[in-house]
C-alpha cells in the first residue's frame, strides 16, 4: 500500500458511503467490523486473510452478546500499519456484558404495579383496620400473607415457667385459623410456618421473588430484636422491609414528642395526647391480591398444641362450651354485644353514679384477649362504641350522664394501654441502656 492510497483512505471526502459508515459491511480487503456474529463478504481475496487464523472465526455462544454491538478489527498487517478499531464497545466474546435482573420478575407483573410482597402477620390477626395488608395489596401485583409460630415463644423460660401456656396457645391457634378463613374468603390465603421469622421470611422472599416485606411494628424487647434481625437478613438479599403502626389508639407518628422523650408519668402523657385526633379506621378489602404464581409455595398446616410442645388442657366451662374462642369474627361479635349493652343502658336512662367500674369490668374481661392478639384494633373499638352512643344520645340526655359513660371508660382504658405500649417501645428501642424511673401502674389497663 503506497502513501497515496493511505491518504485516500484517510480522506473522508474520497470514501464511499459504506466506508464512511462504521456499521456497514465492507466490500474491500480492509479489516472487517463484526456485529456479534462475524459477517463475511463474497470477496475471495478477503477470505484468504483468515486462512492462517481459523481460530479467530468463532460463533458466539452467549445470547447476551447478540444484544450488544461490538466492533473489533482483525488485520493481517503488522501493528505499524493502519488499523480501524471500534470506539463503541469491547468485544463481548472477551468481556461479555450480561444484564441480569437483581431478582426474578413475577410473571404476572404489570407495568403499573411494582412487585410481589410478603405480608408478615404478627399481633395483627385481622383483615379490618389493617394498614399493612391494605398497603401491600395497593402497591403489589401479588401478595403472600405469612404467619410464623416462633419456637422461641414456647417451652420453658429461664425461670422454669411456660413461655406460652396452653390456653393462650390454643387461643392463638384459633385466631390464626380464623385469619386464614377470612383471607380465603377474599381470594387470598395464609402461609403458616413453624420457625424463626428471620429465616422463614427470607426463604419465602427468595422463592416468590419478593422485593418487599410488609409488617406492623411491635414494642417488646424480643419483638424489636426480631425486627432488627429481619431487616439485616432482608438487606443482604436486597429486599425492602416496610413497617407500619397499628396497635394503639393514637398513632405513633402523631405523638407531639419523640418516643425517647415520652413522659414516664401517665398524667403528663394524658395531658399531651388527649387532644390529638384519632385516625379513622381502615375498611377491610372485599378482594385481595392472589398469591404469587412463582415459587409454588406450600401453605402449610396450622400446628396443634402438641406440635408446639404444649400439653392440651381441658378448657370448657361448666356448661360444656369453650370458655373463649379466638378470632376476628368472635372479637367483632363481642364488641357489638358490648355496644348494644351500652345502648340499652342509655335507653333506660340509668343515671346512677359509679357505673364506670361496671362498664370497665364487663368490657375488659370480654375483649382483652382479642385486643392482645390483634384480632380487633383499638380504633375499631373506639369507633364502634362512639357510633352506638352517638346514635342513642338525645337532647334530653344529661351531659355527664350515661350518654358518654361507656365511651369515657373505654377512653380511660385505651389511654392506659397506649401509655404502657409506648413506654415499652421507648426502652426496648433504646440503642443504649437508659436509666428508667418507675411508670405509674393501673390494674384496669388492657393487655
Swiss-Prot record:
Its cofactor is FAD. Keywords: Chromophore, FAD, Flavoprotein, Photoreceptor protein, Receptor, Sensory transduction. Residues 1-14 have a biased composition (Polar residues). GO terms for molecular function: photoreceptor activity. GO terms for biological process: nucleobase-containing compound metabolic process. Belongs to the DNA photolyase class-1 family. This is Blue-light photoreceptor PHR2. It comes from Arabidopsis thaliana (Mouse-ear cress). The gene is PHR2.
Amino acid at each position: 500500500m503506497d502513501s497515496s492510497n493511505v491518504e485516500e483512505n484517510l480522506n473522508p471526502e474520497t470514501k464511499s458511503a459504506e466506508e464512511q459508515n462504521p456499521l456497514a459491511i465492507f466490500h474491500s480487503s480492509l479489516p472487517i467490523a463484526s456485529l456479534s456474529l462475524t459477517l463475511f463478504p463474497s470477496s475471495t481475496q478477503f477470505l484468504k486473510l483468515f486462512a492462517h487464523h481459523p481460530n479467530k472465526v468463532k460463533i458466539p455462544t452467549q445470547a447476551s452478546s447478540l444484544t450488544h454491538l461490538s466492533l473489533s478489527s482483525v488485520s493481517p498487517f503488522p501493528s505499524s500499519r493502519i488499523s480501524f478499531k471500534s470506539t463503541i464497545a469491547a468485544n463481548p466474546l472477551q468481556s461479555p456484558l450480561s444484564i441480569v435482573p437483581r431478582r426474578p420478575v413475577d410473571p404476572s407483573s404489570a407495568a403499573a404495579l411494582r412487585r410481589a410482597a410478603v405480608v408478615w402477620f404478627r399481633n395483627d390477626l385481622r383483615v379490618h383496620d389493617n394498614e399493612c395488608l391494605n398497603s401491600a395489596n395497593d402497591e403489589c401485583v401479588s401478595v403472600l400473607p405469612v404467619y410464623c409460630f416462633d419456637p422461641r415463644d414456647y417451652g420453658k423460660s429461664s425461670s422454669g415457667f411456660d413461655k406460652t401456656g396452653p390456653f393462650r396457645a390454643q387461643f392463638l391457634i384459633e385466631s390464626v385459623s380464623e385469619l386464614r378463613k377470612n383471607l380465603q374468603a377474599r381470594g387470598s390465603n395464609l402461609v403458616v410456618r413453624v420457625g424463626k421469622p428471620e429465616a422463614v421470611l427470607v426463604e419465602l422472599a427468595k422463592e416468590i421473588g419478593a422485593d418487599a416485606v410488609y409488617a406492623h411494628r411491635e414494642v417488646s424487647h424480643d419483638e424489636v430484636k426480631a425486627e432488627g434481625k429481619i431487616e439485616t437478613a432482608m438487606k443482604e438479599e436486597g429486599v425492602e422491609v416496610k413497617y407500619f403502626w397499628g396497635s394503639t389508639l393514637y398513632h405513633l407518628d402523631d405523638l407531639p414528642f419523640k418516643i425517647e422523650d415520652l413522659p414516664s408519668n401517665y398524667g403528663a402523657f394524658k395531658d399531651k395526647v388527649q387532644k390529638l385526633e384519632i385516625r379513622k379506621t381502615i375498611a377491610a378489602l372485599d378482594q385481595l391480591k392472589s398469591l404469587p404464581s412463582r415459587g409454588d409455595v406450600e401453605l402449610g398446616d396450622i400446628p396443634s398444641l402438641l406440635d408446639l410442645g404444649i400439653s392440651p388442657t381441658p378448657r370448657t366451662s361448666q356448661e360444656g362450651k369453650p370458655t373463649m374462642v379466638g378470632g376476628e369474627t368472635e372479637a367483632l361479635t363481642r364488641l357489638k354485644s358490648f355496644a348494644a349493652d351500652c345502648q340499652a343502658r342509655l335507653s333506660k336512662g340509668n343515671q346512677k353514679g359509679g357505673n364506670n367500674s361496671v362498664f370497665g369490668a364487663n368490657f375488659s374481661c370480654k375483649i382483652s384477649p382479642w385486643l392482645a392478639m390483634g384480632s380487633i384494633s383499638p380504633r375499631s373499638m373506639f369507633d364502634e362504641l362512639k357510633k352506638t352512643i352517638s346514635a342513642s344520645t338525645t337532647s334530653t340526655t344529661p351531659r355527664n350522664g350515661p350518654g358518654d359513660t361507656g365511651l369515657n371508660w373505654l377512653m380511660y382504658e385505651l389511654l392506659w394501654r397506649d401509655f404502657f405500649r409506648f413506654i415499652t417501645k421507648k426502652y426496648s428501642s433504646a440503642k443504649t441502656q437508659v436509666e428508667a424511673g418507675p411508670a405509674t401502674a393501673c390494674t384496669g389497663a388492657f393487655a
